[in-house]
Amino acid sequence: DNYLEELKENGEESNPEHLCEEIVKMNIFNSVFVDCTASPDVAALYETLMNNNVSVVAANKEAASSSYDNYTKLKETARHRDIKFLFETNVGAGLPIINTMNDLINSGDHILKLEAVLSGTLNYIFNTISADIPFSEAIHMAKEAGYAEPDPRIDLSGKDVIRKLVILAREAGYPVEQADVKRNLVHPGKVLRGFP
């Protein structure tokens, strides 16, 4: 009942770096770090964790869509350390898309083309807009329904789709960067000023 008081008295301030230090210090065999954030600061810890034999499972798209050099470094570290770097939930809402692609490539197939709806948010918004429901209201509805990122500008700017495209292309064997993705934005930038 008095957890807040106890936390204030006995708790300690934390940050991602401190968390990483504590995990490494524990040195538990077969440790797995699960990142359910969207934080670049947390994603920046993966290399340190992996170099200390901690597997990483990430819903966070930051690492897998970061620079190609960082992405390949993380994949190589996982391979070299015989640990896991998994990010299946980065695309397809957890459907086994990345695993299936890896199975195809490992069996000698080459992925030449992917077709996908890469944004549930944009799909929801475009299916909701009508004469009665303006764009701005559809955005709010998507957010309330749990489709949109906490900051819908990430969806509307195309950033989330670009990250997913980069991750899928890399897993298909193509060394792409986010800057390589051609952008056809569906909104003028000034539309986003009123959000989140």
Regions found by a protein language model. Name each.
Residues 128-129, 137-196:
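Substrate-binding/catalytic subdomain of NAD(P)-dependent oxidoreductase enzymes
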Residues 34-36, 64, 128, 155:
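A generic secondary-structure micro-motif detector
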Residues 39-52, 61-89, 93-104:
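Rossmann-fold NAD(P)-binding glycine/threonine-rich loop
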